[in-house]
Regions:
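Low-complexity, glycine/proline-biased repetitive segments and flexible coils/loops
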Residues: 1-203
């Protein structure tokens, strides 16, 4: 049987009118989570990324939700996937991510993967050359202009349905033992798809 995939770490958020003052700030960079096997093995949610001032308003990018096995996936920056015929995929947090992918296949425990990390999902700019301002691992991410770090969507398990991702995220995940290949994010457009679900021995 397949357990759920882990969620991605919390990513980049946008804010307007935030006042930064001279004081101590605690900055946490969240970590991506691991998958978990077993019939009811819900994966782990991704860690939040945050900036927390000693006094004032915190900024928290919520980690991606875990994928579910026979259980439902958990809501996060992007929602987790869930197994086909048992539970639907979890929704993403409003303003922080997209829904996870649904599971699929011929068995009820082929789970969906975890959701991608939080990001500026669905954000657009008025700049006609805005494509060059997405962080994609090449020099466009260091040029002057508006930079948008888009979060990925959750992937589907086996023959499941992939979710809509954050400006290049999303994609169909494969189950650990084979099945459909995953779809990665598109260059110059942001995050990739959610990670794949796990498979335990004998499944």
């Amino acid at each position: 049987v397949n357990g759920g995939g882990g969620g991605g770490a919390g990513g980049f958020l946008t804010a307007s009118g935030y006042s930064a003052t001279i004081q101590s700030y605690t900055i946490t960079v969240g970590a991506g989570a691991i998958a978990r096997g077993g019939t009811s093995g819900v994966g782990n949610s991704g860690g939040n990324s945050s900036i927390v001032p000693a006094s004032g308003t915190s900024i928290i990018a919520i980690g991606g939700g875990a994928g579910g096995g026979a259980s439902a996936g958990t809501t996060g920056g992007s929602g987790g996937g869930a197994s086909y015929g048992t539970h639907s995929a979890a929704a993403g947090t409003v303003g922080q991510g997209n829904a996870g992918g649904a599971g699929g296949g011929n068995q009820p425990y082929w789970a969906g993967a975890g959701g991608g990390g939080a990001g500026a999902v669905g954000t657009t700019t008025s700049t006609t050359d805005s494509t060059n301002y997405y962080r994609d691992g090449n020099t466009s991410g260091t040029t002057a202009g508006i930079h948008i770090f888009a979060g990925g969507g959750g992937a589907g398990g086996d023959s499941g349905i992939e979710s809509v991702g954050g400006l290049g995220g999303g994609g169909r995940g494969s189950r650990g033992g084979g099945g459909q290949s995953f779809t990665s994010g598109t260059a110059n457009t942001g995050g990739g798809g959610g990670g794949n679900g796990a498979v335990t021995a004998g499944s």
